[in-house]
């Protein structure tokens, strides 16, 4: 749990980019890698997930349509995953290992956050059982570029 808040520049429907390198030997249904918001309200959530839930197993906004999962997530057990999420204020694109797995036109309502959490969500549930090599969050849209680092 952090002692700092989400940057003030990430509010409402503001652009952001998230990048992470994850290794998870056994991926459960819902595992929160990082919850960037302490909110519990619909569309106010920015949570990076590493789970098998096909509806929200990669990115959770506490929406329904706005969330994103990956039906083939279980095939990534024991393999490094390069996860890249970029949102320009309208379109959210999600890539795993250079593959576009989701691209949606969404509307978010991100509010000021009291803290950020690694390894579980703001409700202190959905524990992450894997390894996190790096995690980056930008308050701007950075289009995805192929990494050439994925086997």
Q: Across the structure, where does each feature detected by a protein language model lie?
A:
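Short, aromatic/His-centered strand-loop micro-motif at the edge of beta-sheets
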Residues: 57-82
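Aromatic sugar-binding interfaces of carbohydrate-active proteins
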Residues: 151
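Beta-strand-rich interaction surfaces with strong enrichment in secreted/lumenal proteins
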Residues: 5-8, 69-75, 105-107
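Extracellular glycan-recognition modules
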Residues: 1-58, 77, 91-92, 123-127, ...
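Flexible glycan-contacting loops in extracellular carbohydrate-active proteins
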Residues: 104-132
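Localized edge beta-strand/strand-to-loop motifs within extracellular or lumenal beta-rich domains
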Residues: 79-93
């Amino acid at each position: 749990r952090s002692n700092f808040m989400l940057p003030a520049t990430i509010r409402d429907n503001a652009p952001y980019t998230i990048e992470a390198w994850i290794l998870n030997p056994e991926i459960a249904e819902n595992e929160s890698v990082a919850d960037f918001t302490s909110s519990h309200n619909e569309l106010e959530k920015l949570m990076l997930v590493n789970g098998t839930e096909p509806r929200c197993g990669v990115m959770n906004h506490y929406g329904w349509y706005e969330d994103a999962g990956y039906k083939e997530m279980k095939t990534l057990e024991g393999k490094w995953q390069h996860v890249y999420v970029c949102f320009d204020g309208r379109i959210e694109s999600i890539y795993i290992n250079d593959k576009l797995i989701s691209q949606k036109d969404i509307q978010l309502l991100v509010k000021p956050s009291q803290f950020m959490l690694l390894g579980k969500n703001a409700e202190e549930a959905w524990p992450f059982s894997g390894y996190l090599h790096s995690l980056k969050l930008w308050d701007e849209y950075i289009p995805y570029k192929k990494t050439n680092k994925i086997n």
